[in-house]
Design a protein with these regions (language model features):
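Short alpha-helical scaffolding segments that buttress acidic/His motifs in well-ordered protein cores
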Residues: 49-54, 103-107, 146
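A short secondary-structure junction motif
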Residues: 33, 110-114, 171, 175
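Alpha-helical ds-nucleic-acid-binding substructure associated with the helix-hairpin-helix region
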Residues: 59, 63-136
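Intrinsically disordered, low-complexity, charged terminal extensions of DNA damage-control enzymes
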Residues: 1-41, 174
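C-terminal end-helix/capping segment
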Residues: 161-183
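Catalytic DNA-binding helix-loop module of base-excision-repair DNA glycosylases/AP lyases
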Residues: 124-169
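Short acidic alpha-helix initiation/capping motifs at coil-to-helix transition points
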Residues: 5-8, 43-46, 80-82, 121-124, ...
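Alpha-helical scaffold segments that form or flank carboxylate-/histidine-based iron centers
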Residues: 41-57
Length: 183
């Protein structure tokens, strides 16, 4: 599957304008951020889910390191390369036993359901989440990452994302880490 480069989502400029007008902290961040760098699609749907699985409950640096080793071991991260790699080979990249099972399960599912990702494109956010969460090892956070980074859906706020929570705490100087309770 080829990766189609795309421009900003149609809602992007309007969303930035609203956020800039309502929050001076976000205005400052928006004004100094190159949003095109973050909006470029660089992964296939399979890679987006695989990357989210790899990144579950570990730091971005750790996930990047494992992903680099996985690419070195497998080549392109896709269902075929995951399926042909042994669990031992995958574990050597730093993946846990569970994440190896999750990736193998994802690869098997996509191998048996070739139009799975295409079908997700036309579903509502809730339907996408429900469908993805049926996959072994995929929960709400992974589904939210897919909605954000693959489908570029608006109005997704992953309040279970520790990186997001830590960033909000840092930029707003919040000492209480129970942000989810406030929203």
């Amino acid at each position: 599957m080829t990766i189609k480069k795309r421009t900003k989502p149609e809602y992007w400029e309007s969303a930035k304008k609203i956020l800039r007008s309502r929050d001076s902290v976000l205005r400052s961040i928006i004004d100094r951020t190159d949003d095109l760098k973050y909006l470029q699609k660089t992964c296939t749907p399979f890679q987006t889910v695989a990357n989210a699985i790899i990144g579950q409950q570990i730091s971005i640096a750790a996930a990047d390191s494992i992903t680099k080793r996985l690419k070195k071991a497998c080549g392109t991260i896709n269902k075929d390369n995951i399926l042909k790699s042994s669990s031992v080979e995958l574990k050597k990249t730093g993946l846990s036993n569970q994440k190896v099972k999750y990736l193998k399960g994802l690869a098997n599912h996509i191998d048996n359901n070739r139009h799975y990702f295409k079908a997700l494109e036309i579903m509502s956010d809730n339907e996408v989440t429900e469908n993805l969460c049926k996959l072994y090892g995929v929960g709400a956070w992974t589904a939210e990452m897919y909605l954000i980074f693959q489908l570029l859906r608006p109005n997704i706020l992953p309040l279970g994302d520790i990186g997001l929570i830590n960033s909000i705490n840092r930029i707003y100087n919040i000492k209480n880490t129970s942000i989810k309770k406030n929203y």
